[in-house]
A protein has these predicted regions:
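Eukaryotic RNA-binding helical-repeat scaffolds
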Residues: 1-174
């Protein structure tokens, strides 16, 4: 099975992963909707923890935080220990270090965790998340950026699993 081969490759290659490789692996899992298996999860967390402090740039931080939040929120994966470590790095950064896409990812991750699709709000967030990151998120909406399939899927989880009345909206006034 191809997925088993991928998971074995993660376990074997995790020791040599840099920050970008670890971030990309989390993103690949999140966008494919597949959870890493036990050994691959441990190896990927280890690679993330090893490389995070020295080498994570703003893109790696935003991608990793969003990917882990999406896996938890949409697939029920318990948040691994490295999730809080990556948020700590984000707290130490300034919003100007992130492109708007990264700020949007951080705010999206914040919303997924804050509103507790699977974990509730237990984290500490950068003080600027409510201002600059939310502003980037709202700008994306105002510019009529199409809702991603993940945004629609999260709305579906709120609606179907949490029995909450919600829909994906788009701001139509300035």
């Amino acid at each position: 099975d191809l997925w088993a081969i991928v998971q074995d490759a993660i376990v074997k290659g995790a020791g040599g992963m840099d920050a970008h490789a670890a971030s990309t692996m989390w993103w690949a899992h999140a966008t494919s909707g597949r959870l890493p298996d036990g050994p691959a999860l441990s190896a990927l967390c280890g690679a993330t923890e090893r490389s995070a402090r020295e080498a994570f740039n703003a893109q790696d931080v935003a991608t990793t935080v969003w990917s882990l939040a999406a896996l938890s929120s949409l697939r029920g994966m318990p948040l691994p220990r490295c999730y809080d470590d990556v948020w700590k790095i984000a707290r130490d950064m300034q919003p100007g270090q992130f492109h708007n896409t990264g700020l949007c990812k951080l705010f999206h991750a914040y919303l997924m965790r804050k509103h507790g699709l699977s974990v509730g709000d237990k984290g500490e967030y950068p003080v600027w998340i409510i201002n600059q990151a939310k502003d980037a998120w709202m700008m994306q909406v105002r510019e009529r950026v199409t809702a991603s399939s993940y945004q629609s899927e999260i709305a579906g989880v709120f609606r179907d699993d949490l029995n909450t009345n919600c829909e994906v909206e788009q701001v139509t006034d300035g």
